[in-house]
Amino acid sequence: MEVERVIEVYLAREGIYIPEERLGTMVLELKSWLKPSLEGSGIMKTQEGDFTLIHSHYGEPYHSLSAGAIRECLEKFFNPSGLLEKVQSLKRINILDIGFGLGYNVAVAIKKLKEINPLIEIEIISLEKEVPAQIPPMPKEFRSIHKNILEKLPSFEEDGVSFKLYLGDARESIKKIKDFEAHAVFHDGFSPYRNPELWSLDFLKEIKRLMHKEGVWVSYTSSLPVRKALKELGFSLS
C-alpha cells in the first residue's frame, strides 16, 4: 500500500484532520526517512517559505520542513544558547558549531550578535564531514552574510569575526582543537538514529572539553540516550 494511502487511512480512523499542504510535507518526510536512497536529495521549501536540503545519505532534511529553517535556527539554537545575554557583557563570544550543514546557524548567529553589539568579537569553529555542492540562499535578512561565509570557506577573519571550518570526520577533527572555550555549542548533526557517532559519550566528552565553564550546549534532539550521556558528563539539563 502507498505511504499516502496508509496515512490517509490512519488519520480517518483516528478522526484527525490535517491540511493537504501539511499532509504532503508529512508524506515527504516519512518517505525520505524510510527510503533515503530511493527518494534522493534536493532543495525543499519549508512550511515557513524558506529553503533547506534533503541529505542523500541520511535521508533527513537539514532543517525542519514544518517549523522552517530560520525559525529552527532561532528557536532551537540561537535563542536558547544564552548568547543574547552574553553579547551585552562580553567582549568576545566563542561558538562551537557541530554540523555546519548549510551554514544557516553560523549566519544567524553572526547577524544577530552584531546587531546587538557591533563591536563584539566572534570566533566560530565549525565541524562538517562535507559541505553540499548546492546550498539554497537564505532569506534576504541573512543573505549577504551567508553568501560571504560560503564564498570564503573554509576560513576567514574580518570585521571582528574569525571563522574556521574543519572538514572530515568530526570525531577526529574535534581532537585537533586546542585552547578554545565555547560560550555556546550548536550541536546540529543529523539524528542520533541516523548519525549516532556524533552523539556518543566519547564525542560529547570532547565537546565538554572545549566548553567555557558557563557555556551552554543546545540541540534539537530530546533523545533519551543523549540526555543520559549528558547527565553522566555533569551537564545540567533544561
Where are the language model's segments positioned?
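The AdoMet/dcAdoMet-binding core of the Class I SAM-like
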Residues: 2-16, 22, 26, 83-180, ...
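S-adenosyl-L-methionine
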Residues: 2-96, 199
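A generic structural signal for short coil/turn motifs at secondary-structure boundaries
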Residues: 61-64, 175, 193-196
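Short alpha-helical
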Residues: 69, 104, 172, 224-225
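Glycine-/small-residue-rich active-site loops that bind phosphorylated ligands and cofactors
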Residues: 101, 192, 218
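Short, well-ordered alpha-helix to beta-strand connector turns
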Residues: 181-182, 214
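Cell-envelope and extracellular/periplasmic
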Residues: 188-190
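C-terminal substrate-binding/active-site "lid" region of AdoMet-derived donor-dependent transferases
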Residues: 195-238
